[in-house]
């Protein structure tokens, strides 16, 4: 557990608290092992999310799906997978308001898509930004979760998955992550400044 608490987190990453680190499931002793376990877990979640059965039967614009997808992505690593955070962060909303904000975001996204308020890609970018930056519902894994659920919704509406910086690793420090964070922060500053994030997501 100490390797997690002592880890130097990349810019924009949510540091894992001791209470959350204690919820680690496997016997992992390095960040490298943790990343490998999470990557495998996420791959399995992806297979579930994009399977024809799930794409046909599940509705990603339901609050239950938001939690279920996060659980599927991290349930073999963290006991808090699929559970909303209970602590305040320097990003996202008050933890007591997460369910309310998630429900409102899902309703907004459904309205945007049904009424063609914006082009589908822009709907998805706005949804992604609100989920990861304005709500940030989970203790960790918010970016990876928000990107996958955004892809699922896009595919459900006839669009291709986003490339998110040509498939670059957005978890670790690097030019792609810096560009991704800069695009999110541009939207933080101006809710109509979607160009940078949209271009990054489709690059």
Language model feature labels by segment:
Residues 1-203:
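FIC/Doc superfamily catalytic core
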């Amino acid at each position: 557990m100490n390797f997690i608490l002592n880890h130097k987190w990349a810019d924009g990453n949510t540091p894992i608290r001791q209470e959350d680190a204690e919820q680690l499931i496997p016997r992992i002793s390095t960040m490298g092992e943790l990343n490998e376990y999470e990557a495998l877990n996420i791959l399995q979640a992806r297979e579930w999310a994009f399977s024809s059965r799930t794409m046909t039967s599940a509705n990603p614009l339901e609050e239950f799906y938001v939690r279920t997808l996060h659980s599927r992505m991290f349930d073999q690593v963290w006991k808090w997978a699929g559970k909303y955070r209970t602590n305040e962060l320097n990003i996202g909303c008050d933890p007591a308001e997460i369910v309310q904000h998630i429900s409102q975001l899902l309703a907004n996204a459904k309205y945007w898509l049904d009424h063609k308020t914006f082009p589908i890609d822009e709907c998805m970018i706005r949804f992604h930004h609100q989920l990861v930056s304005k709500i940030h519902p989970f203790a960790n894994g918010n970016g990876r979760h928000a990107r996958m659920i955004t892809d699922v919704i896009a595919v459900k509406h006839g669009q291709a998955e986003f490339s998110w910086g040509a498939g670059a690793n957005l978890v670790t420090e690097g030019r792609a992550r810096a560009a991704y964070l800069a695009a999110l922060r541009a939207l933080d500053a101006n809710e109509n400044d979607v160009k940078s994030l949209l271009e990054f997501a489709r690059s």
